[in-house]
């Protein structure tokens, strides 16, 4: 089950990043984290920027509403999706709440 945390600012989403993949995609859940694959290499924040774009598209939100709050140099990351609810995130990802 995907771990999501509601905060006054929005929803904290745990992500397992897989940089250097063949294509950009949200590839399901792994150990409570959303698995996000991106083609960018993990250098100079390129993969983080790509993951923000992938999440924005998957969640149908503006990139400016997504902030990386921890894991800048780690494959396990935390993102804040501003002004969102857990129900909205689950709906956009096709997860039954």
Tell where the protein language model's regions lie, with residue ranges.
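Residues within the alpha-helical elements of helix-turn-helix
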Residues: 58
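Contiguous, often N-terminal, cationic amphipathic patches that form binding interfaces
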Residues: 1-45, 49-52, 61-63, 67-72, ...
